[in-house]
């Protein structure tokens, strides 16, 4: 297991007690590793790809707990790189538009939100949760015991 995967697994185990922190974390996860598809007025689908199983479980459990969203999971293994990929899809559901609005990703009648909305990161705890989610979605950390490199 890579050093980055170990760090992500450790971050997933950080207890989230406040709903606003879980919202901020899920918002970052979707913003960084998600793809939003629009299928007509008010009809959306979100697709998230991750290599880490614990991150996939976090997205599934948070979206279910916060918004009662169903998520389909597809597991693929890359032959060339010998890595796992988890493909999560939240297809068009009644509460998906409301969820995207609460996560600060989409505003009905206005469109996609650029930047990080202040409503998502009001407190220091929510800001930390947002950064944690962004790292879990697309971060990399080199093992400090090995050679360093710059990306």
Where would I find each of the regions flagged by the language model?
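Intein-associated homing endonuclease modules of the LAGLIDADG/DOD-type, together
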Residues: 1-60, 66, 114-151
């Amino acid at each position: 297991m890579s050093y980055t995967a170990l760090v992500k697994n450790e971050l997933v185990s950080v207890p989230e007690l406040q709903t606003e922190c879980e919202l901020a974390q899920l918002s970052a996860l979707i913003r960084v590793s998600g793809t939003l598809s629009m299928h007509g007025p008010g009809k959306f689908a979100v697709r998230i790809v991750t290599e880490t199983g614990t991150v996939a479980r976090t997205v599934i459990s948070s979206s279910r707990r916060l918004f009662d969203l169903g998520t389909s999971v597809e597991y693929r293994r890359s032959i060339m790189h010998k890595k796992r990929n988890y493909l999560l899809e939240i297809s068009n559901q009644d509460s998906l538009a409301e969820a995207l609005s609460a996560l600060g990703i989409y505003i009905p009648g206005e469109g996609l939100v650029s930047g990080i909305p202040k409503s998502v990161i009001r407190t220091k705890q929510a800001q930390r949760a947002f950064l944690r989610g962004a790292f879990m979605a697309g971060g990399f950390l080199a093992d400090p015991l090995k050679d360093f490199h710059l990306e």
